[in-house]
Swiss-Prot record:
UniProt xrefs under InterPro entries: Aldolase_TIM, Methyltransferase_A, RlmN_N, RNA_MTrfase_RlmN, rRNA_lsu_MTrfase_RlmN/Cfr, rSAM
Taxonomic classification: Bacteria, Bacillati, Mycoplasmatota, Mollicutes, Entomoplasmatales
Catalysis performed (reactions): adenosine(2503) in 23S rRNA + 2 reduced [2Fe-2S]-[ferredoxin] + 2 S-adenosyl-L-methionine = 2-methyladenosine(2503) in 23S rRNA + 5'-deoxyadenosine + L-methionine + 2 oxidized [2Fe-2S]-[ferredoxin] + S-adenosyl-L-homocysteine; adenosine(37) in tRNA + 2 reduced [2Fe-2S]-[ferredoxin] + 2 S-adenosyl-L-methionine = 2-methyladenosine(37) in tRNA + 5'-deoxyadenosine + L-methionine + 2 oxidized [2Fe-2S]-[ferredoxin] + S-adenosyl-L-homocysteine
Protein name, as recorded: Probable dual-specificity RNA methyltransferase RlmN
Keywords assigned: 4Fe-4S, Cytoplasm, Disulfide bond, Iron, Iron-sulfur, Metal-binding, Methyltransferase, rRNA processing, S-adenosyl-L-methionine, Transferase, tRNA processing
Main location: cytoplasm
One GO cellular component term noted in the UniProt record for this chain: cytoplasm
Job of this protein: Specifically methylates position 2 of adenine 2503 in 23S rRNA and position 2 of adenine 37 in tRNAs.
Chain positions recorded as [4Fe-4S] cluster binding sites: C110, C114, C117
GO molecular function list: 4 iron, 4 sulfur cluster binding; metal ion binding; rRNA (adenine(2503)-C2-)-methyltransferase activity; rRNA binding; tRNA (adenine(37)-C2)-methyltransferase activity; tRNA binding
Active site: E90 (proton acceptor), C332 (s-methylcysteine intermediate)
Domain Radical SAM core: 96-327
NCBIfam families per the UniProt record, alphabetical: rRNA_mod_RlmN
Length: 345
């Protein structure tokens, strides 16, 4: 059996027909799951009992298991979920003034080995299925239902590299963006990549309205090679060519994410080099205070404001990202790594 959560509506229609159901059943199922938050075939009362029983022969509809749930002083909520095969993943709910944003995970572990990230301490075991990505949003919506709220924004920035799980990530986007699904607008969805150049170009050619964020963290190959091994395969020059290709095809603005690390990438000279690198692009810089992971040996920069001011003086659009859940291990991979004894508690 396969999970009902893994099907975009058009695929579910085809699969239902192949099993002898009527095509329109797909819209009924989508309405029950994604609009009414019902996760049991038995409760889908406008579907015949015969069809409900038959659906259970072909599809599973079980939720994820919550292993740990932590709430921060700033109302951020971090979930550690257990998958059917026992592996664990993280999801973070970040309440905002404009709605509820959720950071989802796309892989069990990560092979990108960025030196500042807790996710890389646990190597990639496998990709998440589309269903397992969708279920993260489902579980957060279930949590929010107690206060009559819903998820309004998605950032695909959790554990793993989304473009290393390209097809399942894009199917996930299809489902949550569907007018009969979670109805989350494409411009309320952001996918972050560490720089898989061929996939950035492939994503550009889809001409979707989904936002693209680039985990840059350094303006040159010397520093980026030190922080992000992926740069040795796709150096800054090739990455920026892919970004320009994306902007040209989509006319969409790109976000450059930049974690500031003490005495590594936070000097005035580095800020000036960053400004030169992205000047003239339809883009802005998201400066991120570092959530320290002791095992990685890096420290949070003490020069965040000076770096920000330098970029502003250079007429570069930039913001300093608000911190979420600093007191509850809300940085990517921290909670799972602590739960599995990889980093200190």
């Amino acid at each position: 059996m396969t999970s009902i959560f893994g099907y975009p509506k058009e695929e579910l229609q085809l699969d239902l027909v192949a099993h002898g159901f009527k095509k329109y059943l797909a819209e009924q199922i989508f309405d029950w799951i994604y609009v009414k938050n019902i996760y049991s075939f038995d409760e889908m009362t406008n579907i015949s009992k015969t069809d409900r029983n038959k659906l259970q022969e072909y599809y599973t509809i079980e939720p994820l298991k919550i292993v740990v749930q932590q709430q921060s002083k700033d109302w951020t909520v971090k979930f550690l979920f257990q998958l059917a095969d026992g592996y664990k993943i993280e999801t973070v709910l970040m309440p905002q003034s404009y709605g509820n944003s959720v950071c989802v995970t796309t892989q069990v572990g990560c092979n990108m080995a960025c030196t500042f990230c807790a996710s890389g301490l646990l190597k990639k075991t496998r990709n998440l299925s589309t269903a397992e990505i969708v279920q993260q949003v489902m579980m957060v919506n279930r949590y929010l239902a107690t206060t009559n709220e819903r998820v309004s924004h998605i950032v695909v920035m959790g554990i793993g590299e989304p473009f290393d799980n390209f097809d399942n990530t894009l199917k996930f986007v299809n489902i949550i963006n569907d007018p009969k699904g979670y109805q989350i607008g494409a411009r309320h969805i952001t996918i972050s990549t560490c720089g898989l150049v061929p996939k950035i170009k492939q994503f550009a050619e889809l001409k979707t309205q989904v936002n693209l964020a680039i985990s840059l963290h350094a303006p040159n190959n010397t520093i980026r090679n030190q922080l992000m091994p992926i740069n040795k395969a796709y150096p800054v020059e090739k990455l920026m060519d892919a970004v320009r290709y994306y902007i040209e095809l989509t006319n969409r603005r790109v976000t450059f994410e930049y974690i500031l690390i003490e005495n590594v990438n936070d000097s005035r000279e580095t800020a000036l080099e960053l400004a030169k690198l992205i000047r003239g692009l339809n883009a802005y810089v998201n400066l991120i205070p570092y959530n320290t992971v002791a095992e990685n040996g890096h420290q949070r920069s003490t020069k965040i404001n000076k770096f920000f001011e330098t970029l502003q003086q250079q007429k570069i659009n930039c913001i300093v990202r608000r911190e979420f859940g600093h007191d509850i291990d809300a940085a990517c991979g921290q909670l799972r790594a602590k739960n599995e004894g990889v980093i200190r508690k």
